[in-house]
């Protein structure tokens, strides 16, 4: 019910360290679809200034010819863990971000040593705090001397599975030539699942009953199971932080997820209004006419039984029939 949030990092930078082994993985040519990163998770909180982290698997040798070793490069990023306002399921403020709780913190780190299967020692201290329950991903980054993506080649990532994936990160010290594609489309946060059980008249912004609306999209708060367990809000149109809301009512589509933007410019998850429909917007929300809002695009309307004119008949007008073409599509995610 929402567009995926994708994190892409294609990196060209210099690390100053006696252990630096820039270009150690040599010249890379991509001729087919290929994943070049390896992933694991943080299993204990890590604090600013620390030079050691505890992980699920320190070998990080998937897609590499050897296990993680001194001089290798990793990325550390906290993907989730934000808290939201879930006080009132009947208002659109449900889902507004209260605290990021380290979500979004990330940095690039060089390995000093790997003393055991669950520990990575770093040659420089951490710049940020990280909360393990917020799904902190550790990404091993290849260190190429040059990179060529041939025509037909696709550099990509593993899909986000709720713990790892969804991130493509590389380091190139020399020339990068891309004649193919670097593509991680639809590999990030997962959208809500299609649900055909909702009924007429749903007005809530959060609920655990699928009869009230469709499933929300995943985002920086957590996944759908987290919504149902801790927020009583797996379904319906409210946007949980940057995740798009599910539609309320038959045919009311889900919304898009948000990327970066100004949170103050988010207006009820409407997204960017198309000027072609300014007349229609004026019938519905006059304040949105000509305004570009931050965040994901809003979903559609509930079904109508007549073919009316949206430029003259406002949503909810009795002449629409059916479920009155109500404005109950999912709210676009917050930036």
Language-model-detected regions and their locations in the chain:
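Short solvent-exposed strand/turn elements
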Residues: 115-136, 170-173
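Glycine-centric low-complexity/flexibility signal
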Residues: 25-26, 86-90, 131, 146-148, ...
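Autoprocessing Asn-cyclization modules and mimics
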Residues: 21-106, 115-123, 151-165
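Bacterial Sec-dependent N-terminal signal peptides
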Residues: 1-22
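Short coil-to-beta-strand transition motifs
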Residues: 99-108, 140-146
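Extended Gly/Ser/Thr-rich low-complexity repeat segments
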Residues: 62-80, 128-148, 181
């Amino acid at each position: 019910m929402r567009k995926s949030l994708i994190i892409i990092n294609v990196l060209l930078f210099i690390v100053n360290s006696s252990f630096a082994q820039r270009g150690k993985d040599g010249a890379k040519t991509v001729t087919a679809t290929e994943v070049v990163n390896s992933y694991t998770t943080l299993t204990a909180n890590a604090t600013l200034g620390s030079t050691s982290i505890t992980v699920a698997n320190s070998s990080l040798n998937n897609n590499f010819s050897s296990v993680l070793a001194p001089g290798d490069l990793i990325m550390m990023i906290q993907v989730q863990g934000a808290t939201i306002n879930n006080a009132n399921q009947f208002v659109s403020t449900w889902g507004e971000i209260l605290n990021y709780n380290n979500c979004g913190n990330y940095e690039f780190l060089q390995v000093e040593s790997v003393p055991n299967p669950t520990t990575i020692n770093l040659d420089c201290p951490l710049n940020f705090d990280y909360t393990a329950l917020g799904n902190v991903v550790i990404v091993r980054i290849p260190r190429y001397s040059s990179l060529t993506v041939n025509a037909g080649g696709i550099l990509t990532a593993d899909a986000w599975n709720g713990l790892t994936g969804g991130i493509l990160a590389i380091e190139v010290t020399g020339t990068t030539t891309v004649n193919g594609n670097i593509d991680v489309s639809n590999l990030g946060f997962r959208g809500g699942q299609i649900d055909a059980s909702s009924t007429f008249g749903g007005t809530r912004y959060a609920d655990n009953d699928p009869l009230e609306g469709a499933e929300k999209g995943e985002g920086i708060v957590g996944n759908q199971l987290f919504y149902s367990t801790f927020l009583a809000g797996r379904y319906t149109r409210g946007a949980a932080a940057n995740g798009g809301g599910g539609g309320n009512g038959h045919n009311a589509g889900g919304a898009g997820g948000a990327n970066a933007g100004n949170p103050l410019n988010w207006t009820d998850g409407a997204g960017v209004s198309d000027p072609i429909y300014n007349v229609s917007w004026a019938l519905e929300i006059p304040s949105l006419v000509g305004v570009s809002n931050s965040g994901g695009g809003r979903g559609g309307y509930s079904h109508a039984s007549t073919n009316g004119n949206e430029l003259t008949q406002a949503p909810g007008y009795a002449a629409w029939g059916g479920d009155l073409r109500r404005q109950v599509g999912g709210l676009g995610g917050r930036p």
